[in-house]
Amino acid sequence: MIIWNPWHGCHKISEGCEHCYMYFLDRKRGIDTAKVFKTGNFDMPLQRKRDGSYKYPSGMEMYVGLSTDFFVEEADVWRDEAWRIIKARPDMVFRLLTKRAHRIEKCLPKDWGDGYENVLLSVTTENQKRADERLPILLELPAKHKGFMAAPLIGPIEVSCYLATGQIEDVLCGGENYDGARPCHYEWAKSLSEQCKKYQVSFNFIETGTCFVKDGKTYMIHDKQVQSK
């Protein structure tokens, strides 16, 4: 997984943020996650090797903003430049993830039209409340590619009505990590997987999280490699 964080930092806005892994990691490093700043890796997709070729070659996927939210308010002053970088690499795929679905439309670039071919817009759906809040907004937006991430999955979600539209092409799912991690139940992930299968939507379960419940048993899993298996 290639991650591009053009800026760092965010504000907690919903239940999925309660035990945010970035707040945990930043706290260990003495960083205030609530302070949003532009990173030194802002131009990462455009970086080149000594021979002049791109450091990140054609065909790669970049997950954008995993230490922030691409649509966080403080980044409004930098986002147009980030859009220009994204547009300059039509040979790559950029996966933009947000909990701020309500801000997407007004933050799109002027030449967005019906979407950039190399951008997948994705919202977080940690529980039913947020799925019902964010997915209708996503479905109303113009975009060539749409998806959602049920992580941290902290409750069962029924999303068949959204998958049935045919607009959602990619779903990721996973549990919560680090201090205070809430349980992720196997049955919740299995249900979501079956819903995606019914509507032929790509589904990937990326990790169990620290606290995973299956068949009535609770497993505390601290090894990230074990989680992803």
Where are these regions (language model features)?
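Auxiliary Fe-S-binding modules of radical SAM enzymes
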Residues: 1-8, 29, 154, 159-229
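Conserved Radical SAM active-site core
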Residues: 1-14, 18-119, 128-131, 157-168, ...
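Hydrophobic faces of well-ordered beta-strands that scaffold small-molecule active sites
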Residues: 62-64, 94, 119-123, 146-150, ...
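Active-site beta-loop-alpha junctions enriched in small/polar residues
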Residues: 67-69, 99-101, 124-128, 151-153, ...
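A general structural detector for well-ordered alpha-helical segments in enzyme core domains, enriched
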Residues: 78-85, 134-137, 188-192
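Anion (oxyanion) recognition and catalysis
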Residues: 87-90, 142, 190, 197
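Acidic, His- and aromatic-enriched active-site or binding-groove loops in soluble protein domains
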Residues: 118, 122-126, 226-229
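Histidine/lysine/aspartate-rich catalytic loop segments that bind and position anionic ligands
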Residues: 123-127, 131, 136-170, 175
